[in-house]
Amino acid sequence: GFYFRSIQGFYFKRIQGNICSEPKKVGRCRRSFPRFYFDSETGKCTPFIYGGCGGNGNNFETLHACRAICRA
């Protein structure tokens, strides 16, 4: 996954900022995986359907993971 920890928190903050600011990408495949992404306009984790390939890091399997990483 994309959840990294460090004692200083430096790497976590850099990755968190990059992932959470990425746009929602459903991907180019046609599968249907329920996922969550952080919507930077609303400040909330929002459900979407992921196609299975070609997405980005703003793609979480659970609402809990999205909230934990993006602090929503």
UniProtKB/Swiss-Prot annotation:
How is the activity affected by temperature? Optimum temperature is 25 degrees Celsius. The ability to inhibit trypsin slowly decreases as the temperature increases to 70% inhibition at 100 degrees Celsius.
Positions marked as site (Reactive bond for trypsin): R30, R31
Assign the protein's first listed, main location to one coarse class. other
Propeptide residue range(s) = 10-16
Q: What PANTHER family does UniProt report for this protein, alphabetically? A: BPTI_KUNITZ INHIBITOR DOMAIN-CONTAINING PROTEIN, KUNITZ-TYPE PROTEASE INHIBITOR-RELATED
As for what it does, the entry says:
Serine protease inhibitor that also shows protective effect in a cytotoxicity model. It inhibits the serine protease trypsin (Ki=630 nM). It significantly increases neuroblastoma cell viability in an in vitro neurotoxicity model, being a consequence of an effective decrease of reactive oxygen species (ROS) level in the cells. It also seems to protect cells by inhibiting ATP-induced purinoceptor (P2RX7) activation.
Q: What is this protein called?
A: PI-stichotoxin-Hcr2k
